[in-house]
UniProtKB/Swiss-Prot annotation:
Record keyword Hydrolase present: yes
Protein known as: Arginine deiminase
Family: Belongs to the arginine deiminase family.
Pfam annotation, one family: ADI
Enzyme class, broadest EC rank: hydrolase
Active-site residues, as the UniProt record annotates them: 397
Keyword Nucleotidyltransferase in record: no
Organism taxonomic ancestry: Bacteria, Bacillati, Bacillota, Bacilli, Lactobacillales
Gene: arcA
Organism: Limosilactobacillus fermentum (strain NBRC 3956 / LMG 18251) (Lactobacillus fermentum)
Amino acid sequence: MTSPIHVTSEIGKLKTVMLHRPGREIENITPDYMERLLFDDIPYLPIAQEEHDFFAQTLRDQGIEVLYFEKLAAEALASDDVRKEFLNRMIAESGYVAGTTHDALYDYLYQMTPQEMVDKIIEGVRGTDIDIAQPDLQSVSENTDWPFLMDPMPNAYFTRDPQASIGDGISINKMTFPARQRESLITEYIINHHPRFAGQVEVWRDRNHESHIEGGDELVLSDHVLAIGVSQRTTADAIEDIARNLFKDSNYDTVIAISIPHNHAMMHLDTVFTMINHDQFTVHPAILDDKGEVDNWVLHPGKDGEITIEHHTDIKAVLKQALNKPEIDLIPTGNGDPIVAPREQWNDGSNTLAIAPGEVVTYNRNYVSNALLKEHGILVHEVRSSELSRGRGGPRCMSCPIVREDL
């Protein structure tokens, strides 16, 4: 049986991808709430939607099937029993296990169609949306100035992070910050209950862990090699955990853990390092030292289910050995210029989405990086980016590959 998920590289021809079109959740961001919701600016929704539609159409024009996260979720909740279970879990993860507020939220959301319910949960439920005759103590004693009963999910258009397709399976991720943790609950229901996926997908690591990992840090370099960022959003123990699972149950035998700065500008590995061809990568120069090196650790299967760990600094040498390539071409964001590079990296100049070997989708605003990619023989499809980029994520962040051709 052919698996509905199949991703054995970052660069194999992209056949199917999952996106989320930004919705009214974006309009629930205000300056006072940006930090809690992990934003540092507020996109203008109508233009963000136009830009996202242009991005989706760019992918379709290359023959790529585009699925939508919110539609898959609604289809996964077609069964009344599944919908009830999902709703109880979502409300509990929003802070209400029982009580009048829990019951009011349940009644308010349950009377909607599955699509309306999913859209509203992502949008967020304001206190003014529901008339609670007698609020419980929890509601009146906590966050009295906070306007939401259920927080919005404005980061949902970055579909890369709640999960990651690896081989014929998936990791359903425990995300780092509360603002995003409920997104992967939606993923769990898609994988377990959507007819396209249910019972057909290996879950390499589920979301029921204390340690965190996010899809922006998970790069599938080949059919047996992963690179994973040790970052603000992904912990070392989570990397060891998923490595053990993959070594035991899959063809993967190498995980390269790459250390990057733990800050918002470089929150994931794919904001500073992406694979764009068999032997070519984009890299933000700020993660490399004066010798062009970066701390990394190579994990392999050991005895009795354990793993071996080797420390390295020469990332080129590690990649050459792992990928069996005579040379590796690291293409610097912003051509390495001390002003251009951080500016374009801030606007996701390193966050390229490969749709085939040597063919990528990028934001048009990063014109220095795009010109350099073209000089290195890369075919570049530029997409509009004035509003989408305000969320600090680029084309790779906004896409979750479901199927790629093998190399």
